[in-house]
């Protein structure tokens, strides 16, 4: 019967499993934010304000992440710029 199992349609994931996956992503995101310094949201807003002087972007177009290693901290800044026409 193995060959017939191959042709059976794959069932869509249940809404419970989709909700569980989404919740795990949210929890992981919140845990990563817990270890960030207090000044990071203010810094992100100030960077957005400076970029807006030159380019029209939204708040969601700038992501800032602080990674800490043993002896070094890395501030990663990702800015999605609009396409030039």
From Swiss-Prot:
InterPro entries per the UniProt record, alphabetical: MinE, MinE_sf
Protein's GO biological process: cell division; regulation of division septum assembly
Keywords on record: Cell cycle, Cell division
Pfam families found in the cross-reference section: MinE
Record HAMAP family: MinE
NCBIfam families: minE, PRK00296.1
Family: Belongs to the MinE family.
Protein function: Prevents the cell division inhibition by proteins MinC and MinD at internal division sites while permitting inhibition at polar sites. This ensures cell division at the proper site by restricting the formation of a division septum at the midpoint of the long axis of the cell.
Protein name: Cell division topological specificity factor
């Amino acid at each position: 019967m193995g060959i017939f199992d191959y042709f059976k349609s794959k069932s869509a994931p249940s809404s419970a499993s989709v909700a569980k996956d989404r919740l795990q992503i949210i929890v992981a995101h919140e845990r990563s934010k817990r270890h960030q310094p207090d000044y990071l949201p203010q810094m992100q807003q100030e960077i957005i304000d400076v970029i807006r002087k030159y380019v029209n972007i939204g708040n969601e177009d700038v992501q800032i992440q602080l990674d800490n290693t043993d002896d070094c901290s890395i501030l990663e800044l990702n800015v999605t710029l609009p396409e030039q026409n």
